[in-house]
């Protein structure tokens, strides 16, 4: 390991060589892993990932928050390890291809595969085709409750991009002048534990819909609620 940053009570480094792999070290699922900055734990078994995330939380509570002796329960596993995200955000290269930021830099990595988006999104982003120098900087794709699809085009310029669709979806352009609907609706309907949520193009929503349902039910079970209580996610 080569140290890249040294602080008083922690350090950062980058992997140079694996001399002897740990028993739980596995082959990453994605060919872009290690270069793409999106995923950090694909070299770990899923069980080890959960334990590592819990360990990181305990460390941050203690080292940063000064909270020692806090009981941190085991991490509740996700119903799906892959293809669980209802949204994905790409950067658009000036040559017209989609990419993610390279790990540790602002360079872009051209993406041929990603195992995080829901199946409908995975099909959608591969069908997107952009011309060079469109003035679009970021592309977000979203998937709603009934596999309704949305494409969000973000730019810092004021010019409206040329855009055409061959499949049923909603498209929204975000720029300094505001939000302009190019096709379909300005929102998607998301469903969490049979509760509908109207989510606009600029709204945050939990990216793992199935795990959001698990989280909501866990909180409802643990909170001291009365029959007429109202719970808000804010």
Residue ranges and their predicted role:
Residues 1-234:
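Accessory RNA-recognition modules of RNA-modification enzymes
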């Amino acid at each position: 390991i080569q140290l890249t940053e040294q602080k008083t009570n922690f350090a950062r480094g980058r992997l140079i060589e694996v001399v002897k792999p740990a028993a739980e070290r596995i082959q990453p699922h994605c060919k872009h892993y290690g270069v793409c900055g999106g995923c950090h734990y694909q070299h770990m078994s899923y069980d080890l990932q959960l334990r590592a995330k819990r360990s990181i939380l305990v460390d941050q509570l203690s080292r940063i928050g000064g909270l020692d002796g806090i009981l941190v329960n085991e991490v509740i596993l996700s119903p799906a390890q892959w293809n669980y995200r209802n949204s994905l955000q790409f950067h658009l290269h000036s040559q017209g291809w989609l990419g993610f930021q390279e790990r540790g830099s602002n360079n872009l990595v051209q993406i041929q595969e990603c195992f995080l988006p829901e199946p409908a999104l995975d099909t959608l982003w591969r069908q997107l085709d952009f011309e060079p120098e469109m003035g679009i900087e970021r592309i977000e794709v979203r998937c709603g409750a009934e596999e309704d699809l949305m494409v969000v085009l973000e730019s810092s310029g004021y010019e409206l991009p040329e855009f055409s669709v061959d499949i049923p979806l909603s498209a929204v352009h975000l720029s300094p002048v505001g939000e302009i609907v190019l096709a379909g609706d300005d929102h998607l309907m998301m469903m969490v534990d049979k509760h509908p949520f109207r989510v606009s193009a600029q709204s945050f929503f939990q990216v793992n819909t199935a795990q959001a349902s698990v989280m909501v039910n866990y909180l409802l079970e643990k909170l001291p609620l009365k029959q007429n209580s109202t719970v808000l996610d804010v």
